[in-house]
């Protein structure tokens, strides 16, 4: 049927054009027509404008969203109706402009529940929980969405006390809950690692009949795993009738993080379908366990099966290469990334720098750092400074820190740790003390136990025990294992028996099963010729069933890394003769180098 009114023809054409482009997300072209349509006196339908605003928000197209807002003002809608105002609020919040959203909200003639929830949700997603709370408290009425938003907002922010308070108040309000009501509670369980809280949440989900919800069940399993309760996690897993890939991966990750790689790999093999995340969970577990070779074997198998690695897969495998100082494996991973056009993120680039450094190729580390497109991430600088520290280049590390500050990159707590280590390994006591003061005064970094441990190591290695004791007395907290370890380490270097004995006693109290304090104290006694105390200490270790951890060494033979321990000499190591031959040659090189110095 032909359009009789000629004024309606451009409206229909415009509507058709904009609708078409909105569905294709070609917002720039669609919105660019608004000005010409306005000049023709065409007022667009509300539902079309609402649809465009929603797409602007979803694609974070702020410029186009503002054009639509301007179109509304020009065409006489300085105060749009409730529908359009709600969409404007949503668009501004999604585009990270909560102040603009607040202006729209304040100018509304009539607000509905969706308007209030939109503001609360927007503030929560922007991390502005104080403002979200103010709006929530001002609401004339609330529904399940209002309460769910506040619970999950506080839980994700790590404010577990407030999250639980809101959850309890919500349940007391009498408003009917839904499956999403447990999402915030379970997020709090995962973050708090409180077993009793998780059991209560598990019980409530079970009673409510929502255990079939895969997301909730996955959170319950994750919470049990983080509490170290793998039996409960596995029981929950076994009771599930529907298991998706995320459930399997969560349980595998739980076993891997607790070091039970046998259970993790068994479950991995039983998986009906595997994805890059499940492969990465297993690889990362072996890296944490110190089994770099096994992690790299899995990576090669993953590639052979055509599974595409993700960013965390690369960072884990590069850490595996670094842990066994295998430059060849690290280069292979780097080469694969280049061949497959992988654009590495900050963590992967830092892992590359670290891998090359620990594999003895500092030049390659510096080359990777130089070609970084964006050096505004503090992680790059920290890793490079740490690499220079590992190679004993303290002065160069200090120059790198100066460059970092000139580049207007704000140092963080890790920066202070790595620069103190750099100064410690190069004997730069004055420079280390200067940066310790500078970081706290100029950059607002509050020193923690790890920073003081580094400072003690710096002073102790240089033999400045008076200054060391003064710093210990000035600490605003009681020493923890980091600090006592640092004290014992420097006492071992300088043979300070009295302070070393005190540090060892404190470490044994903190971690009775660790053999490290016994061994270091035993070395101090041995250096002083006090063999009766050495024997006595060994007797104490035997009585308390403290076993010395075996030190593992790696050596590359025919492009394969072989691991061996001291005790392997008396056993049938598969490649014992080849290892002996290489070690004999290395010893000869070391003796020759030593004779030259």
Swiss-Prot record:
Q: Do you know which InterPro entries this protein is assigned to? A: E_motif, Pentatricopeptide_rpt, PPR_At4g14850-like_plant, TPR-like_helical_dom_sf
Question: Where is the signal peptide, in residue numbers?
Answer: none
> Which keywords, in A-to-Z order, does the entry hold?
Repeat
PROSITE patterns, A to Z: PPR
PPR repeat ranges, renumbered to this chain: 45-79, 81-111, 112-142, 143-177, 178-212, 213-243, 244-274, 275-309, 310-344, 345-375, 377-411, 412-447, 448-478
Protease recorded as keyword: no
Renumbered to this chain, region (Type E motif) spans: 483-558
Biological process per Gene Ontology, one example term = RNA modification
One molecular function GO term is: RNA binding
Entry keyword annotation includes Lipid biosynthesis: no
| Family according to the record | Belongs to the PPR family. PCMP-E subfamily.
> Per its record, how is this protein called by name?
Pentatricopeptide repeat-containing protein At2g21090
List the source organism: Arabidopsis thaliana
From the UniProt record, report the name of the gene that encodes this protein: PCMP-E48
